[in-house]
Amino acid sequence: PQSNSKKNGVVKNGNGVNGHVLMDFSKIKTGGKFLTNVVGSEKVFCKELFSEEEKMIYEAMKDFATNELLPLSQNELNKKDEKLIRKLVEQMGELGFLGIDVPEKYGGSEMTKTGMCILAEGISFCGSPSFCTVWNVQTSIGSLGIIWYGNDEQKKKWLPGICSGEKIAAFGLTEPEAGSDATNSKTTGVLSDDGKHYIVNGQKIFISNGAWADTFIVALKIDGKFSSIVVEKGTPGFDIGKEEKKMGMEGSSTVPLYFTDCKVPVENLLGKVGDGAGPAFCGLNIGRFKLGASAIGGMMLGMQHAVEYAKSRKAFGQSISDFGSIQDKLATSAILTYTLDSTCYSVIGKQTEAINELDKDDPEYYVKQGNTTEQYIAENSIVKVYGSEAAEELIDHCFQIYGGYGFIEEYPMAQAYRDNRINKIWEGTNEINRMLCGRAMITKALSGEIGFKEYLEKVDVYCNNGLDSGYEGDLKTEVECVEAAKAVYAICLNESLSKHGQDIGTEQVIIENLANILIYAYVGDSTLSRVIQNKDLYVQKNQVVPELCAKVYTAEQGIRVMEYANKILN
C-alpha cells in the first residue's frame, strides 16, 4: 500500500478517501462488501438452505426440463418451430414459470430472487440452450423494464399475456454501430405534430425471440436522450427481418428489426424521456446473472453424459473412467460446477436480503428493486463471466472424453460446444463485464461504501506483520489464500490510482486484471463460506467432495492472482 504522499493514490485520513467525506455505510446492504469482509464471517445462501417450497420449485422446473424438453433437445427444438415453441412457452406459463418477477395482480407469481435463480438452473437441464434463451428473454430483458418502470396501465396491458405465455417478449438494444456502447443508439423517436405518437426510425440487430415476439422493449433516443419504449408486433412501419444463420443456438430466433416512420403511441414510453438506462441496463444486469445461473444445470447434464460415456467406453481392456487423465477432467468439471453453484446462490441471496428490506407499499417499490440489483452489478458480472467461462472449460473436457464421438452430431457434446460460445458475447461481452465489475468496485472503494479506507489500514498491518484472517479451522490455509488475494487487489488498486488517478477507468488492461482478481476472490469466498457453513452437514452425510473442490480451486486459481498482479503493476 502506498503512503499518503502519493498524489493520486487512495489517501487514508479521518475525513474519507481522496477528500470525499464518507457516509456510514456499515449497515447498508450493498454489493462489493465481500472484498472487505473476512471469508465465512457472514452467512451465505446456498442449496443446503432451500426451504421446502424452494425444493418444490427446483424439482418442478427440473422435471419439466427433463421430461418435456430434454427428449426434444437434439432435434425438434433446433428447428425454429414457432408452433412448438409457443406451445411449450404456454405450458410454462400454466406452471407459473414465466411470471416469476410479476405481481399476482398482473398475472404473475412474484417469486423471490432466489426462486428466479432456482428456475434458471432448473430449466438448463433441458439440454437445449436455444430454449433456455427463449425463457431467459421472456423473464428478464423482455419484461423487467415493464415490471420495474411501467405504469399501471402498461403493466395491465402487457404483463398478463407475457406471464401466461400467450405473448412472447423481446428486447431491442444492439445496433450495427452500437453494441457494447448501447447508449450510442442511432434509433430515434420524434414526437408527432399532434403529440400522440413517437415516429421511430432506425435498426436493431441480433434480437433474440425476435421472429416470434409480440412485444418489444426498444431502446432509442428521443430529443437526444436515451429512452425505452414498447413496440407491438404489427405496428405500421415496424418490420422484422430474416433469421440469421448462426454457428450455434440453431433453435433460437435471432433477427434484425427495422423501423421506418413507425408510429408508436406516446403511452408506450416506459418512464419519462431520458429514463432509458433503467429499463435497458437493470434488465441486462439480471439477464447476466441468469445466464451464469442457467449454466449450472447444463454443466451437471454435461458431466452426467461424460461420466456415463467414460464408464461404458472401453480401451486397453478397461473403462476409460479408470484412467487418471479422464478422472482429472471429471474432477475439474466437478470443481467448476460446485464453485459456480456456490457463487450464484451466494450472490442472489445477498440481493434477496436487500430487496426484502424494501417497502412493498412504496409506489416506487419496483423501481427501487431494479436499483437495488444495480448495487450488485459487480457480483452479477462475476457470475456471468465465471459461469460462461466455467461452462466453456467443462464442455471442452467432456468433449475430449468423448474423443471422436464428441465431433459427431448425434452425440450431445457437438451441440453443447457450438451453443455455449455465444455466452461469452451476449448480455455484454466478458470483456465489457470485466470492465463493469472493475469500475463498479473502484467506485464503491472510493465512495466509502464498502469500508475500503479501513480495509487498507488492515492491509498495512498484513504487509508488516503477516496475514491473520482470524479463522481457525481445517480450511485456514485456503481462507488466508483468498484473503491474501483481496489484499493483493487492494495493493494493486492503490498503486494504479497513484499512477493513473481519475484516468484509471480508461486503463482497460488494468481494470480487466483487477476484475480477474475479484472473480477469484468472490468465487473462492462463496465456495469456502458455503463449505465452512455446512461442515457438520457434510461430515454427517460423509460428503468429502465439497471441501476438496474448495481446496483445489483455491490452490490452483490462487497462483494466477500473482500473474494478474504482475500485469497490473508492470
Which residues fall in each region the model found?
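Glycine-rich beta->alpha junctions and the first turn(s) of the following alpha-helix
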Residues: 19-20, 46-50, 56-57, 239-341, ...
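A short core secondary-structure module
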Residues: 196-240
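Alpha-helix capping/hinge segments and adjacent helical runs
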Residues: 18-20, 29-34, 67, 96, ...
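N-terminal glycine-rich flavin-associated loop
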Residues: 131-153, 179-182, 191-194
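Short Gly/Pro-enriched turn/cap motifs at secondary-structure boundaries
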Residues: 177-180, 206-209, 221, 246-253
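A short, Trp-centered hydrophobic/proline-enriched beta-strand micro-motif
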Residues: 165-173
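C-terminal helix-coil-helix/basic helical segment that borders enzyme active sites and/or dimer interfaces
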Residues: 73-80, 338-386, 399-400, 501, ...
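Amphipathic, small/basic residue-rich leader segments at the start of a protein or domain
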Residues: 1-137, 147, 153-157, 161-164, ...
